[in-house]
Amino acid sequence: MASPLRFDGRVVLVTGAGGGLGRAYALAFAERGALVIVNDLGGDFKGIGKGSSAADKVVAEIRRKGGKAVANYDSVEAGEKLVKTALDTFGRIDVVVNNAGILRDRSFSRISDEDWDIIHRVHLRGSFQVTRAAWDHMKKQNYGRILMTSSASGIYGNFGQANYSAAKLGILGLCNTLAIEGRKNNIHCNTIAPNAGSRMTETVLPEDLVEALKPEYVAPLVLWLCHESCEENGGLFEVGAGWIGKLRWERTLGAIVRKRNQPMTPEAVRDNWEKICDFSNASKPQTIQESTGGIVEVLHKVDSEGISPNRTSHAAPAATSGFVGAVGHKLPSFSSSYTELQSIMYALGVGASVKNPKDLKFVYEGSADFSCLPTFGVIVAQKSMMNGGLAEVPGLSFNFAKALHGEQYLELYKPLPRSGELKCEAVIADILDKGSGVVIVMDVYSYSGKELICYNQFSVFVVGSGGFGGKRTSEKLKAAVAVPNRPPDAVLRDATSLNQAALYRLSGDWNPLHIDPDFASVAGFEKPILHGLCTFGFSARHVLQQFADNDVSRFKAIKVRFAKPVYPGQTLQTEMWKEGNRIHFQTKVHETGDVVISNAYVDLVPASGVSTQTPSEGGELQSALVFGEIGRRLKSVGREVVKKANAVFEWHITKGGTVAAKWTIDLKSGSGEVYQGPAKGSADVTIIISDEDFMEVVFGKLDPQKAFFSGRLKARGNIMLSQKLQMILKDYAKL
């Protein structure tokens, strides 16, 4: 059985604790070791009068049972005084239970200003004042638990309680924001809507029902939510009579009611009303960003369905010269250099793991077929988007805080080299006017020398900058494609880690939105979100694994549309449909069902067009002649070499960064053997080296040990055996 929940040493402030729910909370906390401040003004349920007896009786009751408590008789509007009592008596404040409340029930037309104001002063402003007084102390100690008290009247409304309902729902909004702001300091805030007998409810509920709704049936939930082991934050719970339920918002998919070249009308709203109110496929937004984040998806649907935005006023459109004049502008060229370390770091950042043996080729430079993940191509090009690059483009004047990464396209013309330096050239390909925003389309071309390696297209949506009279579509924009209307052919899932964004940002995307809780909070997120291009990398890796056996030479292109944010720790689920060489896919958060990447696809090179033994440039490898010669010369000295070497050497010869051929020199039995292909048994050491470097070793231009330490020669297995290369190649093979 799990250990009981204790509050030893925790200082708990309960407001309105002179009776009813507050009294039950105070007694329960004290019974489990808490040091309790029992606050009660001592008035009646209408907020009239004051006195000390209510709080004193509860304190006395706690002390009789061996607990520790002190009384406070101040109004919750004087929140500083309540918290000062806790600090002066016990030296800290750990838990605040905002429970104090009164009623002034009137039908709406009979509510006076005083009836309205006093309800808000006690419930909403009182909760604010007490919590604010405790907030900084909780931040300094990096710990706090806050409980807000709402009501079914606030959630659903109730006749005769307009003042009370408004205040109680306001408390929920206050809690939701405090949960976001307090998370980074281990301050959790939750809300309950209790059904219990009290001084307030005894006037509106039958006596037998009041008895059934005992405060003791609410207190256990309060204690759990306020315990240090409870990770719940920002929750809303109804509770009463021994029952507890959690509430959440739900939203219909809704309907787009704008038609091309027609004004948006109330008739269009009426005609779509059934769809607007249809909850059969509802979403459940949890953050303000999830609530507003679908705007990009809506705008793309507007385009694809032939619907256009319409101005809601007769104001003249903004000048077109600025945005239009930016089209065709070339940004300064730049170089992106990287080593195997950056390639591996990226692979880990998008979920590659040693737990999956097939991922080893992406995370271990000594792997025989070590490769860059194809989507590393976006890292090469992303400098064009960093460091305010767009801000230098003449005519582009907008608030960059309102810029969203809408879509991404990447095409590879050959596999990315495992390391190297690429020169990148970026140009503003087009700018589209979406009415409520503008889409900036930027093309980035990456070259190795004069050879084009990859091409990226970034589509950036800027909220609120549209309406300048520009064109809405462009043949230059790589089109997103809807997924087929049938069950997926394959589904893969990967759980992201809580450190996923922190790891991915090491690949060069330093946006504080993905690491800084304060910055994320200002942007409307409850915590830092995962990079969209990190989700992009996870998804592409799933497709490559499922339909190309992780063969990077088969990857041709990828197009995605970013729909919603992902939080580190959530599970990414990629749903895939195969149609010829195109793999359509969409990516969801498994826990919520939210689509986070939509209208996406990967184009693959046909498997029949892939050669595993010859380099892409064609032609014979020089090393093949050398291995043939070694085989011939060892015939006369093979037994002697076997005695000295006693090992099986497997060679992986690379060309253009990929394995072009495998050879085995078996010096473990008989007179030895040289043959093309992997070792028939197990190799003692595997050596990875390019065809060019192999020839330099053979001709004595490159020392094997120096090649190893410089990274030009890699070995796995018993790497000490690589020291015998000189003996094999020179002393015996006479090369």
From Swiss-Prot:
Show where the MaoC-like domain sits: 483-599
Q: Where, in this chain's numbering, is NAD(+) bound?
A: 13-37, 40, 75-76, 99, 164-168, 196-199
**What Enzyme Commission number(s) apply to this enzyme?**
1.1.1.n12, 4.2.1.107, 4.2.1.119
Q: Name one GO biological process term.
A: very long-chain fatty acid metabolic process
The subcellular location is: Peroxisome
Substrates-to-products reaction catalysed: a (3R)-3-hydroxyacyl-CoA + NAD(+) = a 3-oxoacyl-CoA + NADH + H(+); (24R,25R)-3alpha,7alpha,12alpha,24-tetrahydroxy-5beta-cholestan-26-oyl-CoA = (24E)-3alpha,7alpha,12alpha-trihydroxy-5beta-cholest-24-en-26-oyl-CoA + H2O; a (3R)-3-hydroxyacyl-CoA = a (2E)-enoyl-CoA + H2O; (2E)-octenoyl-CoA + H2O = (3R)-hydroxyoctanoyl-CoA
Q: What segment(s) does the record annotate as region Enoyl-CoA hydratase 2?
A: 321-621
Subunit text: Homodimer.
Further information: The protein is found both as a full-length peptide and in a cleaved version.
Q: Mind telling me what this protein is named?
A: Peroxisomal multifunctional enzyme type 2
This chain's source organism reads Mus musculus
